[in-house]
Each structure stands twice: as C-alpha cells, then as structure tokens.
C-alpha cells in the first residue's frame, strides 16, 4: 500500500472547491432538478439488497471527484494487496485475511509462501464435526446428559460479532440456548450462571492467547462454579472448549486440546466472527447456515474486489462518508436497523469502525491534520425515533444516517411490519425534505386555525430537512444477506482507512489503559493510602478503599 496524504492530492483540492459550490445546495433541489435521481444514485446487490444513496448532498460530479480521490490514493492497489495476502498491517507485520476465512471459491491465498486455505478448511471441518455432536445430543456432559446451554466467554471481537450474529439470526436458531459473557464485572458471569445447569452447559473460552484478563477471569470463575458441582477436574474437558492458539495454557486449564479451535494472526479480533470465534454461531444456527453466512460475505468480497468504483457499493458508501466527515465536518454516523433482531448491529460496527479508524497517526507515522474515523452509534427503529431522532431532525449537528430494513419479516404478525416499514420510509423522506414554514401555516389553515394567532408556535414546527441518509433495503435477513451486509460495512471501513492514510487493522489505543490497570491492580489489594499517581487518580483510589472497608 502507498502512503499518500489525501489532503495533498489534487482530488482533495478539487473536492474542497466543489464543497464550496455544494454546501448550500439542498437535497430537495437535487431531486427537483433530476427526475431520474433515484435510478442514478441507487444500486442492487444480487437482487437481495438495494442501496439507495440518492438522499445525499451529492451530484454525479461529487462522486466523480471522490472517485478521483480513491484513484490518487491508490485504493485499487490497496484492495489487491489485502486480497493477495500482503502484510498491510505493517505495525504488527501481519497480513489481513478475514476474506480467506470465507473464501468459498477455495482459490489459493498465499501468506509467507504458503496457501492458507487448507488450514482454514480443516478448522471449518473440525468445527462442523464438533458442533454436530453437540447439537445432535451425541456429546454428553459428565452425568450423561446432552448439552442444552452454551456460554461464550470472550470480549471485544470474541464477543461482539458472535453475539450480534446469533441475535440477528434468531429465526434460524436450534434448541440450544446461547449466553454471552464479556465484562470482567462479576455481575455479568454471575447472572448467566444463575440461568444454567452445570450438567448440561458447554463453555466456549474465546481468547487467542488464553491470557486476556477479562476472558480468563470469567473462564476461571465459570470453571470454579462448575467444579463445585462436578467435583472431579477431569469433567472440565466435557464442558469446556477453547477458541485459541495457546495449546499449553488450554491444556493446563483442563480443556482437551482436541477441542481447541485455532485461528491465525492474520485474523483481526473485530473481523474474527468468520473464524473459530464463530463456533457459537454454528452452535446456535447450525453449520449449514454458518456456511451461508460465509457465502454471503464472499459474494460481497467478490463484488468489492472486482467491481469498478463507480458501481462498487462499499466504495460508494465509504466515499460518501468521507464527503461528510472531511468536508462538511460531520463527526458521527448513525446506523439505524429497522429490525429488532439486528439490535446489536450498530454496537458491532461501533467497534468495527472506531477501533479500526480511530487513529491520529498516519501510515508515515505523522500526526494527521484532518479528520479520520467518525463516531458510530445507533439503535433499532422505531425505538430511536422516540429517543434521539429529535436531534437528527432539528438539532444543530449533521448526522448522516444509514437506515437498514428487510422487506420480508420473519414474524408477519398482523400489520406490525407495514407499520415498521412505513416509519422506515417516512424518516428518510422527512430528513431529506423537511417541512417548510408555508406548509406548517397551511396545515393550521386546513384545521380552521389562524396562523397569525399561532405565530409563536410556527418556528418550532418547521423542519429544515437536507439531512443526509442512505437506505439499505434487504429482501429478507438471511444468513447469506447478513454475511453480505457485514462484509459491505467491513470493506467500507477499509476503504476509508486506505484513503485517509491510516492503518485500519491495528489497535494500539487499547493498550495504555490495560498497562495502567495492571499497575493499579496490586495497589487495590490492601487498605494503604495511594500517592503514586496524579491527585485525581490517587483521590479516586483512596475513596474507593475507604468506602469498601
């Protein structure tokens, strides 16, 4: 990958001039001037996904200039580098190959002179065999009973992805009950353990190194809880499996290393649901549905790696995001799924985007003088409408939004879905076009009221509109379409990182807090006053000690 400061490109300078021309143009004007706007600014993927980006403050010229920026920063070369196994994560000297995990074509992908696909397929086959034994009831616990509950113990990418997917695919789930524990707060594991039976529970310990503080603390607490009933440590092997590469530590914990599922250093945590970390997904929805998830992602990988930029959905969404982030000064993006099963989707890509592109140092090691990754947030519709949409509609901050919905629901209850989708369609229309003062006054007249007498209220009922949105309409949320949707966002994030000249696949920003926590932990072991930190941290620690006494 080339290390190019985007602000020094001619395309960036052209975009700055173009922004000056576009900043006062409204979405309403853009639609009024082009009856074919929807056709020009929307695209479908495999007849399963419609992406409508017409309600944005963009023209064909805008997109052309943004695509020039992608060319000048050598996006095409970066895509080729990632898919070919080049070590584009240079700060950790690693390839970035989550795409290999879902490479259903099985074409060779070479890292350090070795095709990784045989190992990928071997782990998949091992996961298939193990999961079938658990799901069928063939696998027995220490008292001879079949497994009924699965507890995934992980954090970050070892939790957020599997939890999001198992929730999104609940309509496909089998009889096993899934639980997820991540927080080192003892409340999390304690509340889950209240719900399960040690005789029929399988724990998955998801930690590549088997040393992650939060995960191993929870794993040892789960083991202690289990042994209070089971007694003999040999029974641990029937109720614990590991998603790890540290065979020595896994064996010492009491887990049979035959039930250790490996993944590789070219799998980043927040891109790991496609790997052995996805074992909880397989146990929830079955191996065939997991393969469909992989296949959907692979289809999007193929689209991303082969489709020209002007029709490439991840690239288009990435470029539009840069337009708002770097030229309009928008600091956040909202992800708003109109599907309750997708309630963890925004949280998943909060990590996916903010841990990837939340960087202030460029690939040359220099501090940037431009904006990098945005703040990502969101909640399912229609709940968000009764919470934070007020600010999106009438606040002073621009919040570009992605609205996501399925045309077909898994729960066709009465007219619920029509009401849900009526809100989905209405919100993007309202955000784009607003409501003028004239319309508000006419509404009063239609009600037989004199607008002049209500002059004090009229300004508060005016909506400026001109608030940008993308609409992503899925035919139905299936394992395949969900896989494609996740990969769409992954590649959007990568595209933005390439153009913004940052390393998307490391996360050094999480390390300092860990180091300081390891230093502070021993200081909490006694009641002595602390003076080794700044006055604020000392004061907080000492008050904690006083109150716990």
UniProtKB/Swiss-Prot annotation:
Enzyme Commission number(s) from the entry: 5.3.1.9
Residues of the active site: 355 (proton donor), 386, 514
Gene3D superfamilies hit by this protein: 1.10.1390.10, Glucose-6-phosphate isomerase like protein, domain 1 (3.40.50.10490)
The keyword Cell inner membrane belongs to this UniProt entry's keyword annotation: no
Top EC category: isomerase
Catalytic activity: alpha-D-glucose 6-phosphate = beta-D-fructose 6-phosphate
Subcellular location: Cytoplasm
InterPro entries: G6P_Isomerase (IPR001672), G6P_Isomerase_C (IPR023096), Phosphoglucose_isomerase_CS (IPR018189), SIS_dom_sf (IPR046348), SIS_PGI_1 (IPR035476), SIS_PGI_2 (IPR035482)
Record-linked Pfam families: PGI
The organism's place on the tree of life at top rank: Bacteria
GO CC terms in record: cytosol
Phenotype when the gene is knocked out: Increases acid tolerance in rpoS mutants, defective in glucose metabolism.
GO molecular function, one term: glucose-6-phosphate isomerase activity
Pathway linked to the protein: Carbohydrate biosynthesis; gluconeogenesis; Carbohydrate degradation; glycolysis; D-glyceraldehyde 3-phosphate and glycerone phosphate from D-glucose: step 2/4
GO biological process, one term: glucose 6-phosphate metabolic process
Keywords assigned: Cytoplasm, Gluconeogenesis, Glycolysis, Isomerase
Known function: Catalyzes the reversible isomerization of glucose-6-phosphate to fructose-6-phosphate.
Family: Belongs to the GPI family.
Protein name according to UniProt: Glucose-6-phosphate isomerase
Species annotation: Salmonella typhimurium (strain LT2 / SGSC1412 / ATCC 700720)
């Amino acid at each position: 990958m080339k290390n190019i400061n985007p602000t020094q490109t001619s395309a960036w300078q052209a975009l700055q001039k173009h922004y000056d021309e576009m900043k006062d143009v409204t979405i309403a004007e853009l639609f009024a001037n082009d009856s074919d706007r929807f056709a020009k600014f929307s695209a479908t993927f495999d007849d399963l996904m419609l992406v409508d980006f017409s309600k944005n403050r963009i023209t064909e010229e805008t997109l052309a200039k943004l695509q020039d920026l992608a060319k000048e920063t050598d996006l095409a070369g970066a895509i080729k580098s990632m898919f070919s196994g080049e070590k584009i994560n240079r700060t950790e000297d690693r390839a970035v190959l989550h795409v290999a995990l879902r490479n259903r074509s099985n074409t060779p992908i070479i890292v350090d002179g070795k095709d990784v696909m045989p190992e990928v397929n071997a782990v998949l086959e091992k996961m298939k065999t193990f999961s079938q034994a658990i799901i069928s009831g063939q696998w027995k616990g220490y008292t001879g009973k079949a497994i009924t509950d699965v507890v995934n113990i992980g954090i970050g990418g070892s939790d957020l992805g599997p939890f999001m997917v198992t929730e999104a695919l609940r309509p496909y789930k089998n009889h096993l009950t899934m639980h997820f524990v991540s927080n080192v707060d003892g409340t999390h594991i304690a509340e889950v353990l209240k719900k399960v039976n040690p005789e029929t529970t399988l724990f998955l310990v998801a930690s590549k190194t088997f040393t992650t503080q939060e995960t191993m603390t929870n794993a040892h607490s789960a083991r202690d809880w289990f042994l209070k009933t089971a007694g003999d440590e040999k029974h641990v092997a029937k109720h614990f499996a590991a998603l790890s590469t540290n065979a020595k530590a896994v064996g010492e914990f009491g887990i049979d290393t035959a039930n250790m599922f490996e993944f590789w250093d070219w799998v980043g945590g927040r891109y790991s649901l496609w790997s052995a970390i996805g074992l909880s997904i397989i146990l929830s929805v079955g191996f065939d549905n997991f393969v469909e998830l992989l296949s959907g992602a692979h289809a999007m990988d193929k689209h991303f790696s082969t489709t020209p930029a002007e029709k490439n959905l991840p690239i288009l969404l990435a470029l539009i995001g840069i337009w708002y982030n770097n030229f309009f000064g928008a600091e956040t993006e909202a992800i708003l799924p109109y599907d309750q099963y997708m309630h963890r989707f925004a949280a998943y890509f909060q990590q996916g985007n903010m841990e990837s592109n939340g960087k202030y140092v460029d690939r040359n090691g220099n501090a940037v003088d431009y904006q990098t990754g945005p703040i990502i947030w969101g909640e399912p519709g229609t709940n968000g409408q009764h919470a934070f949409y007020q600010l999106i509609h009438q606040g002073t901050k621009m919040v570009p939004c992605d609205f996501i919905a399925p045309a077909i629901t898994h729960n066709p209850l009465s007219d619920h879905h029509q009401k849900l989708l009526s809100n989905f369609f209405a919100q993007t229309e309202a955000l784009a076009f607003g409501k003028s003062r004239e319309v508000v006054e006419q509404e009063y007249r239609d009600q037989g009221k004199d607008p002049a007498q209500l002059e004090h209220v009229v300004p508060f009922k005016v909506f400026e509109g001109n608030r940008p949105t993308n609409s992503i309409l899925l035919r139905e949320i299936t394992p395949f379409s969900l896989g494609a949707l996740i990969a769409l966002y992954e590649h959007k994030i990568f595209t933005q990182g390439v153009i913004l000249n940052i390393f998307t696949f490391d996360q050094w920003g999480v390390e300092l807090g860990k180091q300081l926590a390891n230093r502070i932990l021993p200081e909490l072991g006694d009641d002595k006053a602390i003076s080794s930190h700044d006055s604020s941290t000392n004061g907080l620690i000492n008050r904690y000690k006083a109150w716990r006494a």
